[in-house]
Amino acid sequence: MRMFFDGREMGVSNKNEIMLAVDNLVALHRAGRTVWQEVDRDMQIREKNDVKRRNREMKRVHNYIAKQSPKREFESLFMQAFPYFYEQGLNCEQAEAGTAGESEHMGYCHGTYNHHSVLVCGTADARYIATINFEKYHIGNQLQDLYYFIRKTVEKNGYAFALLTAILERYQQGIPLQQMDVAYICGLYRYPEKFYKLSNQYMNGSKTRISPKMVEKLNRIMEEEEKKQTLLEKLSSYNISKK
């Protein structure tokens, strides 16, 4: 059975709607945790964050491009950027190996919770949020949903640290967070997600003609890297327990 909602996508620059989306995520996670604990505890938990596999895929793309001669603009830029981003991936792999298994945040996860999955419905007097796009719904660490929402939303707002902390504090009003949870989110964010996805896009796309947009995307990733690292530096020293 399908349900249809008369609404629009959440305004990714509208702070009020962002906070409504966080409240909605809290409700989703509470329900998802209860169902998993009381009904589906024996169901398989998805591997939390397969960094090792992703790193292998990035290395495979690197090895493929290394053999190309002559190299086109995207391929040359990729080879220049690869050592920096691959090192980030390896650091994340080592950090992941040292993390504990099951977390108190285990439960059903949305999988792709961002502004495209949140509809603002109703009128100004009777507004409500609807959640869509459950294709990647699974059992896992629900903090991955929170991280994904933070990353997508913060990057659309110029890597604003104040917005990131506002999201964390709003989430904590409904589901308590500890310092280790902030460290976990920070660890997820350190992975070079955009570079990894672009490498996959290259590998799965046409090699006959590489779109100029690929070069634009890679340049943008490198240009935004300083903002990302500044944000992560602030997040790593952020104390959630004092909020």
Language-model-detected regions and their locations in the chain:
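Active-site acidic catalytic loop and adjacent metal/ATP-binding pocket
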Residues: 93-144
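ATP-dependent phospho-/nucleotidyl transfer catalytic cores
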Residues: 8-13, 38-109, 166, 216-217, ...
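ATP-binding pocket architecture of kinase catalytic cores
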Residues: 1-40
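Active-site activation/catalytic loop segments of kinase-like enzymes and analogous catalytic loops
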Residues: 143-176, 189-208
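Gram-positive cell-envelope targeting signals
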Residues: 2, 26-29, 70, 75, ...
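Helix N-cap / loop-to-helix initiation motif
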Residues: 177-181
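ATP/Mg2+ or Mg2+-diphosphate-binding catalytic cores
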Residues: 195-243
